[in-house]
Amino acid sequence: QQSGLDFISTPASEDWVVPLSELCDALKIASGDIDFAPTIKAAADSALPVIMSTGTAEIAEVDSAVALFKSVRKAEVLEDHLYLMHCVSEYPANIVDCNLLSIPYMRERHGLDVGWSNHVIGPLACHAAVAQGAKLIEVHVTDQKEGREFRDHALSFEPHEIFDLVSDLNSISASLGLLQKRPTLSEQQNTRAFRKGLVYSKDLESGTVIEDKHISFA
């Protein structure tokens, strides 16, 4: 809180939702609970935003979980109430298995912001996820990778890497712009210099009727 960061936690069961709600700014539903109605209902019954991870889930299971949440939260629009996280539950995950197009797919299907829960070694999948429209990025963090045996350390980020990752992701997000095509203000000054113009192909006497053969482009 002193650093201005939101505190988010995952209830291990429905019994943990109420006590965690008193401490947290948001709750997260783990991938393993995508089909566990008691925890989803309890989280939806809270007043907090909920982040729902979708690792191992079929799209029909995601549909059911979203519908269950909506039926309990009773919000006409779920935006700002529920966020989905695309996730590949492998440790580490291979980048060719990421299927990051699931991010825009679920966004369009459910009308919700979708994020990426990263288990790929390195920042590349996170970069690509933001380029696909991910609004949240979740990564594992460790104080030290070297010499650690547990699987999560290899795919985790050390503190100095987090600063670089956040900087890169902010730059990528800023580069996306709007869903349109128009010249930027900075490049509009170059339009005339980049386009071709009409010139005479040779010197002409006064009164000459201009024909195609007299014209060149440069």
Where are these regions (language model features)?
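Catalytic cores and adjacent flexible loops of soluble metabolic enzymes
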Residues: 1-218
